[in-house]
A protein has these predicted regions:
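Conserved catalytic core of nucleotide polymerization and phosphodiester-bond processing enzymes
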Residues: 1-281
Length: 281
């Protein structure tokens, strides 16, 4: 659950965000095995990160039952974590972000939300600056490392970021040139027959999504050693056990998907799911 936000917070040491996840995870684990009438009420500090940022947007306490408000908080936490600006944030909401409802906020409110996010998540914002430096290092052939990743280049504009599983993200033919339409310089790299732009927030997104995928893929391999995995979608894994082993399979999958990998031992991971005789959400 919420794996990209968790990886982004972990990669840049946004410790308050990680602690918020730990508290909400602990509450969920505590009450999950209890009948609904025996569950204690959730405290404000046990709400998830989406609800918490919803407070900022709406100026009141947001709970999971506030579906629209929490959804907007989710869009903020996921989208703004990769350097999305106010104008794009406004357009994203108006189009129906993440398949959700269309929401129209004035630009001034979007600017306030973006500023507030960056101030509250200042270590993530600093991570974008680190990523900008990584781009420049790759272009110049300068090597470096941060936590579980390392990077370098051949000195001729071809750069790469090495991931903890041995795979790499490649950025060939990096160039910095002025974008006359936008009025500022930007980095681009060759992708097939096209040139694609790359900047701090976008490289951050690439790294976070790659690391999140590695986590889920390794979890899937652990599960597949005991129960046959039949499909995966984003951060979802589906296995096909015998009916009599369904509950055991679910418990095993839950254990696998909440266990960090060796290169990120302190990241808080969470999962939710269930079993049925047919595939459903």
């Amino acid at each position: 659950g919420q794996i990209e936000a968790r990886v982004n917070g972990w990669l840049w040491d946004q410790t308050d965000l990680l602690e918020a996840f730990r508290k909400s995870d602990a509450y969920a684990a505590e009450v999950s095995a209890l009948p609904k009438d025996q569950r204690r009420p959730m405290r404000e500090d046990e709400r998830d990160a989406y609800c918490r940022f919803g407070d900022v947007v709406y100026g009141r306490t947001i709970w999971k039952k506030d579906e629209l408000e929490r959804f907007i908080g989710k869009v903020c936490v996921l989208g703004l974590g990769f350097q999305m600006g106010a104008a794009k944030f406004q357009t994203t909401l108006a189009k129906g972000a993440l398949g959700g409802p269309r929401v129209n906020f004035p630009l001034s409110q979007c600017e306030h939300i973006v500023r507030t996010y960056r101030a509250a998540n200042y270590r993530i914002a600093e991570g974008w600056k680190i990523c900008t430096q990584i781009i420049e290092d790759m272009a110049l052939g300068v090597s470096g490392a941060h936590k579980c990743i390392s990077w370098g280049g051949d000195g001729d504009g071809n750069g790469w970021v090495l991931l903890p599983n041995g795979m790499s993200l490649k950025y060939p033919n990096l160039r910095k040139a002025r974008n006359e339409e936008k009025g500022f310089e930007e980095w681009t790299y060759q992708s097939g027959e096209m040139r694609k732009k790359i900047y701090g927030g976008l490289l951050c997104e690439n790294l976070v999504q790659a690391l999140a995928r590695i986590i889920v893929a390794e979890q899937m391999l652990m599960i597949d050693k005991k129960y046959r995995c039949v499909m995966t979608t984003h951060d979802e894994v589906v296995a096909h056990p015998k009916l009599r082993e369904a509950e055991k399979c679910y418990q095993f999958m839950y254990q696998c998907m909440t266990t960090p990998l060796w290169w990120c031992p302190d990241i808080p991971l969470a999962a939710e799911g269930g079993w049925a005789e047919n595939y459903s959400k």
